[in-house]
């Protein structure tokens, strides 16, 4: 994208791609975030006063129970995200190795694993930022990829690093995203997002002056503003305080409640255990195990299940 900034509020855009909103979160208790209010519900955000404080509490959004998503008619493309043997190599190094998974519309799905296991590379491929070496993915049956503008236009991407313009304020980032994606009622919606993420006191501060946690939350607000059908959140909780983690989880559950596919990569297994409907345990670019957090954890924790899976795989390789 070619962007020139002639001064605050004076932005000249010569492309239709904004990485931070591409056309483009540890929780101690097993809380179901879907039971909280949804700040992004159209009735609660679009009609919310700009001030964002002292606003009436929005009505709760009912979300289906885990795994309770109805099957799609066989004559129509399956709703949701589907990856088939997605692979990415860099020279002789394979970072993502034949990744295959599905995520239904209305689900929060976690990619869980340690640093360097291929989560960010997968997110970049799904966001249309990085081309796959081989394999495919679809969103609601439509092929995705670097040149798939229709899928990219429905995708909100929270990258692991970068994506913000240091000289632009939080509000100017939202305005740029709204203009690129023709978001209706974006001012009320944007003000609500900033308030929900405790950024309303920094609305007109430049992003270059933000802390890392504030930058992560601003990236989330940008990605959520257009109401994407696919939300990609790459390590969104990194550097974010507990209140911010809770707010991000509530927003992600709200997006899923409205039918979006939400894919979250994280190494914080406690968060994933509370937030996700399905989780995929990833090592060296491949899925080792997948299922609901409860099924994988059994009588223990998800962290314990991950260690058991790793140990079993290591013993099998000897």
Predicted regions and their residues:
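Helix-to-loop junction immediately C-terminal to a conserved catalytic motif
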Residues: 127
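Conserved ABC transporter NBD signature motif
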Residues: 135-146, 151
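Conserved ABC ATPase "signature" region
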Residues: 175, 179-202
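Catalytic Walker B motif of ABC-type/P-loop ATPase nucleotide-binding domains
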Residues: 231-235
